[in-house]
A protein has these predicted regions:
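Short active-site neighborhood of thiol/selenol oxidoreductases, capturing the structured segment around
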Residues: 73-103
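Short, acidic, Ser/Thr-enriched surface-loop or helix-capping motifs
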Residues: 64-66, 188
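N-terminal targeting signals for export/organelle localization
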Residues: 1-61, 218, 222
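Structural microenvironment flanking redox-active thiols in thiol-disulfide oxidoreductases
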Residues: 98-158
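Thiol-/selenol-based redox modules, centered on thioredoxin-like
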Residues: 173-222
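Structural micro-motif
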Residues: 143-146, 156, 160-169, 179-185
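Short loop/turn microsegments at loop-to-beta-strand junctions
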Residues: 57-58, 82-83, 181-183
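Generic structural signal for well-ordered beta-strand positions
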Residues: 70-73, 194-195
Length: 222
């Protein structure tokens, strides 16, 4: 009588290129899923960082310098203009001047009709030194931004509503600078925060302008 061989069969090795192909296909499926998910969340491929859902923006109330005198100023989100809001200070050595210059470059690239529907609001994080007149002189050097002095404690509340942090940092030999969040917030004509850019992104004028135009054309949407 013949006895059956009870030894388990040796596993057959899979060629390396088959394993590589399986790994590539798995990676492609994963990337495809990520791409579909991001397109569902935001069908338009924004350059800036998009809010998961548009958030109501906080208004800005303070003092500005216009017509040769200090006057009250209020930015009320939802009054019909697409608005870029940036928090900084006039003694800033790099981030603030770069941000204002980049935003002006994007504004200049717009059509006259687009410029009429767009504004930049520059909020000082250093109200002790940044008087309304100093702010106006500083902002106008870079372009057409409206600069605003907001006093404490209102400033702290406003900054928190935009998730902006800031702190005084002493300088060697005296004085101080303000360390702060370097984001610029884009608010649509319906008053919703739609996206933000970091200063490192703002130099890409064409891509920034593309974001602005999309937000202009879709107020209240994503």
């Amino acid at each position: 009588m013949t006895r059956a061989d009870t030894r388990s069969a040796e596993p057959v090795g899979r060629p390396w290129y088959v394993s590589a192909l399986v790994a590539v296909l798995a990676a492609l499926l994963l990337l495809g899923g990520v791409w579909v998910y991001t397109r569902i969340r935001s069908p338009f491929p924004y350059y800036g960082t998009v809010y998961d859902a548009p958030q109501q923006a906080a208004g800005v109330s303070g003092l500005s310098f216009t017509g040769g005198k200090v006057t009250p100023y209020a930015f009320t989100p939802g009054e019909g203009k697409t608005t870029a809001v940036f928090f900084g200070f006039t003694h800033c050595p790099d981030v603030c001047p770069a941000t204002l210059a980049y935003l002006e470059r994007a504004r200049q690239a717009m059509t006259p009709a687009e410029r009429a529907k767009f504004q930049v609001v520059f909020v000082s994080l250093d109200p002790d030194r940044d008087t309304p007149q100093r702010l106006n002189d500083y902002a106008k050097y870079f372009g057409d931004a409206r600069s605003v002095q907001v006093k404490e404690p209102v400033l702290a509340t406003l900054a928190r509503s935009y998730a902006v942090s800031y702190v005084k940092a002493p300088l060697p030999g005296g004085g101080y600078q303000i360390n702060h969040t370097s984001a610029t917030f884009l608010i649509d004509a319906a008053g919703k925060k739609r996206l933000l850019w970091d200063v490192t992104q703002l130099g890409e004028t064409a891509r920034v302008l593309r974001d602005i135009r999309q937000v202009m054309n879709t107020p209240g949407n994503t």
